[in-house]
Amino acid sequence: MSKVCQVTGKRPVTGNRVSHSNIKTKRRFEPNLHHHRFWVESEKRFVRLRVSSKGMRIIDKKGIDSVLADIRSRGNRV
């Protein structure tokens, strides 16, 4: 499974690991993803999403129904 947040679209980015002697090697910055079950009252069921911590805050703010509508409008099946 890809490491992409289903709410925000956050994905890994690349950067440099820098040693004490300033030698740079490539590394990946991974998003803080979690599999989380959300109760959807309108559908009377749980929905399991792969979301970042930022995505969880967005769901708390906007509500799960609004966020699911956005995800489904992008063509993703939930």
UniProtKB/Swiss-Prot annotation:
Identification of the protein by name: Large ribosomal subunit protein bL28
PANTHER family referenced in this protein's UniProt entry, alphabetically: 39S RIBOSOMAL PROTEIN L28, MITOCHONDRIAL, LARGE RIBOSOMAL SUBUNIT PROTEIN BL28M
Domain of life where this protein originates: Bacteria
GO biological process entries: translation
Alphabetical list of Pfam families matching this protein: Ribosomal_L28
Protein family: Belongs to the bacterial ribosomal protein bL28 family.
Entry keyword Ribosomal protein: yes
GO annotations of cellular component type: cytosolic large ribosomal subunit
UniProt key word NAD: no
Any GO MF annotation of the entry: structural constituent of ribosome
UniProtKB keywords: Ribonucleoprotein, Ribosomal protein
Disulphide-bridged cysteine pairs: none
